[in-house]
Amino acid sequence: MESESESGAAADTPPLETLSFHGDEEIIEVVELDPGPPDPDDLAQEMEDVDFEEEEEEEEGNEEGWVLEPQEGVVGSMEGPDDSEVTFALHSASVFCVSLDPKTNTLAVTGGEDDKAFVWRLSDGELLFECAGHKDSVTCAGFSHDSTLVATGDMSGLLKVWQVDTKEEVWSFEAGDLEWMEWHPRAPVLLAGTADGNTWMWKVPNGDCKTFQGPNCPATCGRVLPDGKRAVVGYEDGTIRIWDLKQGSPIHVLKGTEGHQGPLTCVATNQDGSLILTGSVDCQAQLVSATTGKVVGVFRPETVASQPNVGEGEESESNSVESLGFCSVMPLAAVGYLDGTLAIYDLSTQTLRHQCQHQSGIVQLLWEAGTAVVYTCSLDGIVRLWDARTGRLLTDYRGHTAEILDFALSKDASLVVTTSGDHKAKVFCVQRPDR
């Protein structure tokens, strides 16, 4: 039986300030918004009318609708244990990235080594449209804050944006070699970091652009802070910069002994944006105050386990931080390392609380909203759920025949969507016992 999830909306949020572009002047100004919902037509006209308010519509989930019979591009079963509900199999090479539409969590976009990106439906794996035109591996993909736009970026620096409802391309740009890409949390504004050290910011689909020039080395990771006014960017030389998106200048710069001693690999912020966590190939995670720009804590695993299955060609002595994040309900942070260590740190005491070992390197971790459960995916192709309070493994999900390269978690934590070197993306239905 097949059914489709109906769209819905987030709860009311107070009016927010506006980020604006002014042509070639590279000036961003903050404008107070009048109460009431914005006119969508205004967003597509003047740059000063960019709206940061979240859409206010009702959202309704769908708890059924899984299709068990194979369709074109959907694998219903495979040899060995497979806990997944749906497998998307239209990619012909490794699938590098996945993102879910934030408004309804009913659509996914995936990008791969086959130079292709697809937008498809989670409930049955049905292809909605292909994001065509890339000429290199698609390593970044994501939906805008209101799920109306989807962006894809390839390694060569070609970025494209499509209107989801019309399935039409509305914008494209060729930057330098792409390192990361992220939508602004409240506006149709796209940010990206490139190998030349620049961080780019575009109004979509107008295309008005602003650049933030970093050191003469790749901008390896970045994240817009929750207030939408600042962004933190990490660089290959170990430098961390917190940028003011209004002024176009760095508020804080951490470098030398203040920064990392190796390239930045990942960055995360807590819910209110007061704290930033950065990870590096130097095996350290640094806790930084977003207000003062000072390092307030440094985390490193107490013991470094032997590194089983870190991958062919990897240097065994390297134990980089691969992923990290903050718990939303407790003062905890999780750090995942290449050697397979998941470290849970207590932020209030800045001590290691639990150390959970995987059999192979961790690729990514995500916290479940509203709980102390952290999800990990690793090079052994398994998704694991951990209770950060006890360090206990709750359950795992299997089905891939190669390493997992990325994963996404639905807002209600009912679905996990993974991508893998086995050329497939999978949807897992998560059982949620009382936490």
Curated annotation (Swiss-Prot):
PROSITE patterns: WD_REPEATS_1 (PS00678), WD_REPEATS_2 (PS50082), WD_REPEATS_REGION (PS50294)
GO biological process, one term: angiogenesis
Top-level taxon: Eukaryota
Region (Disordered): 1-65
GO cellular component: cell surface; cytosol; intercellular bridge; microtubule cytoskeleton; plasma membrane
UniProt-annotated location(s): Cell membrane; Cytoplasm
Cysteine-cysteine disulfides: none
Family matches, as InterPro entries: WD40/YVTN_repeat-like_dom_sf, WD40_repeat_CS, WD40_repeat_dom_sf, WD40_rpt, WD_repeat_multifunction
Main location: membrane
Signal sequence extent: none
Modified residues (Phosphoserine): S20
Function, in words: Plays a role in angiogenesis and cell migration. In smooth muscle cell migration, may act through the RhoA pathway.
Protein name: Angio-associated migratory cell protein
Provenance organism: Canis lupus familiaris (Dog)
The gene coding this protein: AAMP
